[in-house]
Structure formats: structure tokens, C-alpha cells
């Protein structure tokens, strides 16, 4: 939502972000940035039902209210995951393939986090469309709905006339941990490892969990030593400052600060 809010601010558009969650009144992480960009954030209290159902109902209600005010609406689904949103990573796949060829990284496997599936599907279709030698593996960071993914692919196939099928999609589902945006100690370790060895910041929800999954796959010998890997960084750094994540990092990193007189 925050990047949508930023784009809306740049082009003078009104932005409303709808989410289902528990809100403690603290603006931090993405919520703080949403506010800075001038977006209106509507938080639906989680009533225990399926979150997708609650979100759909709330979005419908908010849109009806805005239409009654005379507003014109352009709806963007969670993660921008529709046949338009996936085009960003469709183009990314072509750019990535060109860079791989330039650096003679042929036949490498690209790893990406998989949430609302737009990133994965865009990459998959882009690589398939240009007959890239790069392979693609997704690391699910939340329960994967395979039927939904297949339906999403069929929508894209119809919209853009793809001639290939989705029979060789590969998404690992064994590294979800506790669920969406619920990293464990192994994920935090993976984030620290990347930061301390490469100076790159991963996030607790997507890229950190993806990298932790890759490390587990290496330990389990699903990935052989010497294999060529490309880890796709999809952003998300503000998530490090979400209270629930920050507090755990602070406890684990407390000994990195020394006070002297």
C-alpha cells in the first residue's frame, strides 16, 4: 500500500488503503509512511473470520461510500496482484535475463518470495515468454492457494495471449513458518546474516523469510553446493520497524551496544 500511496501523492490522487488487522494506535513501519504520503488508512478489526472475506466486504463497503460522494474509483487488489500489476515483474524478468546473459549466469535459479502471487506470476510469464534459460522457484511466505494461482494464470493467458501453460511452476510451501508476517528466530537470523555479510537489509515478512527458506533448502540439500542462485530483493525494509518485529530484534541485538563514560 505504501508505494501506491507514494504514487498517488506524486500525481495528486486521493488514496485509501483498506486492511484487516488489530491496531494498537501506534503509527510505525508502513502505517507511518502511509500517513506521511497523505493516504487514508481504514483498519477493519479482525473478527476471527477468514481475512480475505472480511477484506472483500470492507473494500466493497468503502467503495460504495466513496461512489456516493461522487468519487471515481480505481481499485488495486492486495499486492497489486492482477493482470495489470503482474506486468511490472514481467518486465523485470526480461531485464533480469538480459543481466544474467551479460554476466554469463546461464541456467541459474531465481528465488523470490510468494505472497499474493503477482511477483511470481509476472516473473514466470516473463521468463517463459522469452524462453529464458533462468529457472524460477518461489518460496511461499503464507499458505498457497494453488487453484487461485492457476485461475490467475488463466486470466493472464487470456489477457495477453500466452501460448505456454503453467505445468512447471515451482513453489516451495514448507517454509511458511507460523504464517503471513510471522517470522521466527531463523528468519531473523537470516536477516542478520545478509546484513552482516552483504550490507543488505531484508524484511521480516517477505525477503527475510525467502532467504531463510533458501538457507534451509541448502541444509536439506535441496539446493546443491555450487549452484547458481539469484535472490530477488522485492523491498519491504520498513517492516523492520513494525513494533512486534523491532522488539524481538532489539532483544537479540542488545549486546551490540556498549555504553562508556
What is the predicted role of each segment?
Residues 2-14, 124-130, 213-222:
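Alpha-helix C-terminal capping segments
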Residues 1-5, 10, 27, 116-123, ...:
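Short glycine/serine/threonine-rich phosphate/pyrophosphate-binding segments
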Residues 167-226:
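Active-site-adjacent helical/loop segments in soluble small-molecule enzymes
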